[in-house]
Design a protein with these regions (language model features):
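An N-terminal hydrophobic leader/cap segment in hydrolases
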Residues: 1-51, 57-60
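Catalytic nucleophile-loop/oxyanion-hole region of alpha/beta-hydrolase
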Residues: 79, 105-136, 141
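Hydrolase active-site cap/lid region
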Residues: 160-218, 267
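Short beta-strand/loop motif that positions the catalytic acidic residue
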Residues: 232-233, 239-241, 245
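Conserved alpha/beta-hydrolase "acid-adjacent" motif
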Residues: 246-252
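Catalytic histidine-centered segment of alpha/beta-hydrolase-like enzymes
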Residues: 270-284
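Active-site glycine-rich loops that stabilize anionic/oxyanionic intermediates
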Residues: 67, 74-78
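Conserved alpha/beta-hydrolase
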Residues: 87-110
């Protein structure tokens, strides 16, 4: 009886700690942008706000062509400045680029919601894309979304919803076939919370499993999106993964991309979010080839 009571008490403690830790994981400590477009020599840019369902998203707009638009996301716990390198490349190709902080990140609004969080992040992508097209582009502009790590999940979900008129999608270091894969990957890579009393490998592993489970519950998403849903069947998609990515293993990304006929998968010799750094030439060669193909098709269809 005492053993059973102790086991139940241990399980209850793990569930309690996991609830707090999962909430904190999806509402991370903020990191304000640490670099700005002007640090890269861009003069024609400004700060803008995107109105969303519960507040405002803070962003930077890099002015370019009105018929070439790009929305750029970031990883969990980071801010828009983490994706400046990719944004600068797109801007040099002539794109008008919007980098923005997801809710609960950077300088965007705080959303204290504890459930339905995946839907809210997807709404961020949709609202930012719609604002970019309506206020800073032409009606028939090519609109590209580039997501990295965590933001690849809501970016793909936004294409599946089909309301944001996304013409092409690039995903760097994600997403995987399961929502739980992202969180377990973080923990496997050593980014799990250090909780007093959970120092043994066994207790820590049990806690991390519980945190991942509770985080998935809080996201509240049906994943992965069905191949025929929304615009998935018509939208060209490029997925870039790293062969040594221990947060989002390439096998997990491949299991997802195998579901979609319009998906192209490129595997580089690098880790998580390291492709544009460690394999820079090939990373941007693959990206440029994809963009050229997308732009050509868009033009042939009668768009600008």
């Amino acid at each position: 009886m005492q053993i059973n009571d102790a086991s139940r008490g241990e399980a209850a403690m793990i569930r309690l700690v996991a609830r707090f830790a999962a909430f904190a994981l999806l509402h991370p400590r903020r990191r304000p942008p640490h670099r700005r477009p002007s640090d890269h020599g861009v003069a024609d840019w400004r700060s803008i706000s995107v109105v969303t369902d519960r507040g405002r998203l803070d962003g930077w707009l890099l002015h370019g062509r009105r018929d070439r638009l790009a929305l750029v996301g970031h990883g969990i716990g980071l801010s828009r400045s983490a994706s400046l390198d990719q944004a600068m490349h797109l801007h040099r190709r002539g794109y008008t680029v919007l980098l923005f902080d997801l809710r609960n990140h950077g300088r965007s609004h705080r959303d204290p919601s504890g459930t339905g969080i995946a839907d809210r992040f997807t709404t961020d992508i949709e609202q930012a894309a719609q604002t970019l097209r309506a206020d800073h582009g032409s009606t028939d502009a090519l609109l590209l979304v580039l997501g990295t790590s965590f933001s690849t999940f809501p970016s793909l979900a936004a294409v599946a919803r089909g309301s944001a008129r996304i013409d092409a999608l690039v995903c760097d270091s994600g997403p995987g076939l399961t929502l739980d894969s992202l969180f377990t990957g973080f923990f496997r890579a050593g980014f799990g919370p250090r909780v007093p009393g959970f120092r043994s490998p066994e207790r820590r592993a049990a806690l991390y499993r519980a945190i991942a489970s509770d985080a998935v519950r809080r996201l509240g998403s049906s994943w992965p999106p069905e191949p025929a849903k929304g615009d998935l069947a018509r939208t060209p998609m490029l997925f870039i993964t790293g062969s040594t990515d221990d947060i989002m293993p390439p096998s997990e990304v491949r299991r997802l991309t195998d579901r979609y006929d319009t998906a192209q998968l490129v595997t580089l010799d690098c880790g998580h979010l390291r492709g544009n750094k460690d394999q820079r030439e090939r990373y941007y060669t693959e990206l440029d080839a994809f963009l050229t193909a997308v732009e050509t098709v868009h033009t042939d269809r009668g768009a600008p």
